Amino acid sequence: MIKVLITGDTHIPTRARKIPKIMEEIIQSNKPYQAVFFTGDLISEKVLRYVKSLSEKVFIVEGNMDYLSFPEKVTTEINEINIGLIHGHQVFPRGNIEGLIRIAKEMNVQILINGHTHYAKIVEVTGEHGSKIVLANPGSLTGVWSGGFASMRPSLIIGYFKSREVFLELYELYGTKLETKGYVFTF
């Protein structure tokens, strides 16, 4: 089984000082990760060093607030499932499902990881000929504000890939209460 961390939009130190303790505990207690996907807006080199310490394989895209240089889009594959990573500022309005589907098709990916909205959301869309696209947005790891409809809740996703089955576990912090939701997809 392959385990990955999906996170982003920390905005440290401009909008948050640090990762909330409970989110840090989740990250540390679930190690090791075979890969980390970061949706951009990490802002500082300190956060970059931290993210790179979590796995030997780290994928990062440039957010609209990053001054550090990263690619705009990344594609990779796990168990023959094509995965794309973008920040999400490429679509308007923020989080627009049709725009994200268009990008997923352009990138030829079955899973599109995106951020920017600061609102965690996992949806499956059935396309032509029964094909499916999963849109996975981990929200903001620090739960900071954004220019749209941010949830203001720290959140992240841990993904498990076993053959052609993918289990995504979404963690969201509501004040001091941690909630988890699981999603299973077969490709």
What do the PLM-derived regions correspond to, one by one?
Residues 1-5, 75-84, 126-135, 161-168:
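Beta-strand-turn-beta hairpins that frame and shape the catalytic cleft
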Residues 6-8, 35-41, 59-63, 84-87, ...:
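Active-site neighborhood of phospho(di)ester-bond hydrolases with catalytic His/Asp-centered motifs
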Residues 12-15, 42-46, 65-70, 91-95, ...:
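Active-site environment of divalent metal-dependent phosphoester hydrolases
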Residues 54-58, 123-142:
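Short acidic, glycine/proline-enriched helix-loop-strand junctions
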Residues 102, 107, 136-187:
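Binuclear metal-dependent phosphoesterase catalytic core
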